[in-house]
Amino acid sequence: MKINGNLNIDSPVDNKNVAIVRSRNQMFFKAFQVAPNIWIVPERYYGESLKINEDQKFDGGIYDSNFLSTNNEKDDFLQATIKLLQRINNNVVGAKLLSLISTAIPFPYENNTEDYRQTNYLSSKNNEHYYTANLVIFGPGSNIIKNNVIYYKKEYAESGMGTMLEIWFQPFLTHKYDEFYVDPALELIKCLIKSLYYLYGIKPNDNLNIPYRLRNEFNSLEYSELNMIDFLISGGIDYKLLNTNPYWFIDKYFIDTSKNFEKYKNDYEIKIKNNNYIANSIKLYLEQKFKINVKDIWELNLSYFSKEFQIMMPERYNNALNHYYRKEFYVIDYFKNYNINGFKNGQIKTKLPLSKYNKEIINKPELIVNLINQNNTVLMKSNIYGDGLKGTVDNFYSNYIIPYNLNYEHSINYFYLDNVNIEEIEKIPPINDEDIYPYRKNADTFIPVYNITKAKEINTTTPLPVNYLQAQMIDSNDINLSSDFLKVISSKGSLVYSFLNNTMDYLEFIKYDKPIDTDKKYYKWLKAIFRNYSLDITETQEISNQFGDTKIIPWIGRALNILNTNNSFVEEFKNLGPISLINKKENITIPKIKIDEIPSSMLNFSFKDLSENLFNIYCKNNFYLKKIYYNFLDQWWTQYYSQYFDLICMASKSVLAQEKLIKKLIQKQLRYLMENSNISSTNLILINLTTTNTLRDISNQSQIAINNIDKFFNNAAMCVFENNIYPKFTSFMEQCIKNINKSTKEFILKCTNINETEKSHLIMQNSFSNLDFDFLDIQNMKNLFNLYTELLIKEQTSPYELSLYAFQEQDNNVIGDTSGKNTLVEYPKDIGLVYGINNNAIHLTGANQNIKFTNDYFENGLTNNFSIYFWLRNLKQNTIKSKLIGSKEDNCGWEIYFENDGLVFNIIDSNGNEKNIYLSNISNKSWHYIVISINRLKDQLLIFIDNILVANEDIKEILNIYSSDIISLLSDNNNVYIEGLSVLNKTINSNEILTDYFSDLNNSYIRNFDEEILQYNRTYELFNYVFPEIAINKIEQNNNIYLSINNENNLNFKPLKFKLLNTNPNKQYVQKWDEVIFSVLDGTEKYLDISTTNNRIQLVDNKNNAQIFIINNDIFISNCLTLTYNNVNVYLSIKNQDYNWVICDLNHDIPKKSYLWILKNI
């Protein structure tokens, strides 16, 4: 799909890609065709008045009649929308989506017999020109933050015929969900998917809604319902869980829609395909359209596209809505912040300015909670905002009878857009002006809908979670924390509520200390604030009760006033269990079922006919029982889990509120320091940078807390299902099974045309047992739930900030980083590569060889944990200091260097506090696994060598180690191999090191023929890969003993027995790059040497004369090995003097397989 990016607001009208077109209400606009049949009109949507009454304005909306009124704004809109379309088109599935929209022209209207008229067109002023249009993208309507998709004609949108459509779209304003910005490309994709429902004529009825959640915030039982299109398009957890063959998908919509679409597909074949009066291009477009099945459209959802585009999105529809909090909007500059790959710095790291419109957001809560005292005086008003969904008091489950005779119609195939052929579509010629015969009545009159609501109010004397949440929010920069809720709400804004006990204790403890007016004092204060906040917000506690062992979050009670009687959350949770966390506890409705009786007409059937018919009934009953299961599952998801999910949302917001308070305290202290100290400007810049990094680290700790919240409430929800719902389900199911078995048995016993043996066989064959149903095993349910309820709240970035790789190309060596952090890697061309423990290792030999890795993730500071690990092989003695790896600037940071035949790790802060750890001799030419882990919360430095903890140092006095964004790997006159250099943004524990160490080692071990690890001092026979059945033996010639093979089956030749010896007598297993000596057991012990006369391998008596070989495995054949001496391979020669000799020399004519050797157990 080609996107026309060469358009601007001043592009001249050519009546092809730029035209003045008529709208449905006879207004005229300048329109731009940016792709076949896809147009952009950079104007506000004409169907809504830009000036509306206050009562017509939506909650959370923004209204500005002047938005998008100047030519500059209109051009910006045009360019932004084009860029988003280019971004979508830049991905294969996005290009397929746009191609599909381009081809999905509505079926022509049959005006008279063989007289077909187009309904998808735009017209010029005097109807002189017509332009094919499937969709037209406008700016927003009256509410400038609302995106919408409007069909031209409802009848065509629902009948299978299809209709063109209009999109209202706002590209400039976005909002955050938790820590990431919502990508406008995904918002546009949502509109584009929805447009396919209209173009294909498969729009569901407006009343087809899905039970979505029980509204926990109301006293009465009220429900939210999700429109079918929004449900299908959103995807995510709801779609996965509720789409496991859900019973409500057995709806006439899915049956009728498929039939309607097939009707028009058939009409195309009969009436259109060979109609000479219809333009060929129209027929080609329709042919492409009907290659797509309706089910292909139903399968398209945002979850799929978000993964294909690597865009973060909320995994529950409810997550994206205004609920308990207000969105803040940010402005996107498409030249500075965005390109065809998305946000230039990612959805988290991009920094967007807040919109000026945030002060103009319409505030219309759905519910106002008045906290009153015993005198009915209002102490506090808290707002709860709508979730944007249709509300109802009808309990869907109490009225719904599970259908017995309707089959499940919709299944997910996961073959997304496989039938869309972009290349074929691009070859379709455009539909010309003269090809269009317009049908004038192609559009309904657009009538805007305004949601006029009035807030409900409730009074409560017990503070609700929303009251506690509101008390934690403050706009003032003058912050004083208090753990006394009543004192806070009585303070008229001078206090803010906090449950961070350690943090408040620390602030109280230092309240009367001397002013913080030096960088060192500030660093110590900042570090203490960070540590105490981390301890508070990530606190968990293991408990055991009748519901099992679980990890709870003690502060939840204090944060949201849940089970908070005298701060006894832990005890009350122990006693009452997870069901006590929610308000509405008895919601399960026993499903209404209706199972048909077995027809009496079958009583006289023969055994064969009866078997077949009873089997069909058995299958139908089996499926019906599954429908009952999904009914229970849906009820739990919508009525119980939705309440726990509300608690997840509120608790997460509480964490973010506390984080905001702490950050304001830090910023306040930083301002004081800058205004009241004599610190140099250079140090102030450093303090600012360090504070920024600490604020980032605080956000990371908050994310850990949010993850804890997620796990805690999800586990609680699962526990409620297991203990409160599942027993009712199993009891009901067992009774259903018992009744079905009973009626089946009674019927069979009445049958007159079969004998007793046949009756017994049929009864056994058509009776159910509990073992027939996986869902009667609670563990299967747990597995399903755990699979679907890991909520994606924040970008799950890799902990790796550097992950070194190296490989050889034809003309040069390539070194790079696989961490995904956009690291700049600079290195000289003379850097060598050798094969290391698992992969290529970098060989540093020359003076001042330097590899530089640059990215801003390397900037350490005061509070961030990090780890460094790598494999190291040192080939040289180092008596004087020689640098190896480091990240230092102005003598601040960390580095690793050689000195006195050992390795030294040095860390030094900006105040000169320093720690040096000397590691014992590692110059024995062996590979060593080095791990260095810095834990700033525990003030702990751990160093491991080969899985052994060699250093455990206190680094309490080390403060700010802010250094540059560069890590250097250099050769300061070293001779070393480095493999797998990695830097992580977290600590590494001993178990992780153990796993990684032995995983690497396991891959580094040399294997024998049976894939077993080779061992030193163990006896083997040696074979060459070319002759894998003929062992190496000895040949005596000219007073020398050489190695060869017995290629004449001479029984006098006996295979030699070999042992591998290592220079380190304590080493047991053979690894790659080991230096080995071969011992040969031939009467007396002999050793392998290389003849200086002919380069043959010969036997010598003295071990001191033996040659030391380097042993390696073959990359492609794991049970083969190679042997080298001075980088020259040992191989089996071609036949010479009747023998194939074992030789070590440079012979380039020898096949590579001759270099491969095999050791077999004896």
Curated annotation (Swiss-Prot):
TM spans (from-to): none
InterPro entries: Bot/tetX_LC (IPR000395), Clostridium_toxin_transloc (IPR036248), ConA-like_dom_sf (IPR013320), Nontoxic_nonhemagglutn_C (IPR013677), Toxin_rcpt-bd_N (IPR012928)
Gene3D superfamilies referenced in this protein's UniProt entry, alphabetically: 2.60.120.200, 2.80.10.50, Clostridium botulinum neurotoxin b, 'coiled-coil' domain, Metalloproteases ('zincins'), catalytic domain like
Keyword annotations of the record: Virulence
GO cellular component, as recorded: extracellular region
Pfam families: NTNH_C (PF08470), Peptidase_M27 (PF01742), Toxin_BN_H (PF22133), Toxin_R_bind_N (PF07953)
GO molecular function, one term: zinc ion binding
GO biological process: proteolysis
Keyword Zinc: no
Source species, domain of life: Bacteria
SUPFAM superfamilies, per the entry: Clostridium neurotoxins, 'coiled-coil' domain (SSF58091), Concanavalin A-like lectins/glucanases (SSF49899), Metalloproteases ('zincins'), catalytic domain (SSF55486)
Record has 4Fe-4S as a keyword: no
Family listed: Belongs to the botulism non-toxic nonhemagglutinin family.
Subunit structure comment from the entry: Forms a highly interlocked heterodimer with botulinum neurotoxin type E at pH 6.0 but not at pH 7.5.
NCBIfam families to which the protein is assigned, alphabetical: botu_NTNH
Primary role: Assembles with botulinum neurotoxin type E (BoNT/E) and protects it against pH-mediated inactivation or protease activity at pH 2.6 (the pH of the animal gastrointestinal tract) but not at pH 6.0. The non-toxic component is necessary to maintain toxicity.
Descriptive protein name: Non-toxic nonhemagglutinin type E
Taxonomic source organism: Clostridium botulinum
